[in-house]
Regions:
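Active-site-adjacent structural elements that line small-molecule/cofactor binding pockets in enzymes
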Residues: 1-158
Length: 158
């Protein structure tokens, strides 16, 4: 089962997983029979300037999802529900940069693993390693060939 990327660790654990468990039980299945796959937001890069640019891309993606009324529940879970209509209004005006600017550092770090490349795997495993069986990188920015290979290797070992 693919879990939506617009999630946080606490939303996944407190809202999504219990809903999956209820659905599994209603169908006579155990939660353990359902493999979860998560596209996790990741902000990383080889230096501070690259990380800042990559963070801007992830902030924009979070803002885009946050503008969608059906995803307001994730924001409300963290006390950010009032941001949703503002993001929605800005999206209708095509103000994409302004939308991303509304995603502060606390929100960014709640939605995304923000880490140097050598710490990304540990960040993902620490948040999601005990609840998802597969993970992909939701990283809306370019990286050089082979960039993700050591991170993938560490995740496979973890």
């Amino acid at each position: 089962m693919l879990v939506h990327g617009f999630t946080t660790e606490s939303y996944l654990r407190e809202i999504t997983i219990p809903a999956i468990e209820r659905g599994a039980a209603a169908g006579g299945r155990e939660r353990s029979a359902i493999e979860l796959s998560l596209p996790a937001f990741v902000v990383t890069g080889p230096d501070e300037a690259t990380m800042a640019a990559n963070a801007a891309g992830v902030r924009s993606q979070i803002a885009f999802y946050g503008s969608t009324p059906n995803y307001r529940g994730v924001l409300e879970h963290h006390g950010w529900g009032d941001l949703q209509p503002e993001l929605n209004a800005l999206s209708k005006e095509g103000k994409w940069v302004e939308m991303g600017n509304l995603i502060d550092d606390d929100m960014l770090h709640t939605f995304a693993v923000v880490a140097e490349p050598t710490e990304v795997a540990a960040g993902i495993l620490g948040r999601f390693g005990d609840v998802v069986q597969r993970v992909s990188f939701y990283a809306p920015y370019a990286t050089p060939a082979g960039f993700w290979a050591p991170i993938v290797a560490e995740l496979q070992e973890g």
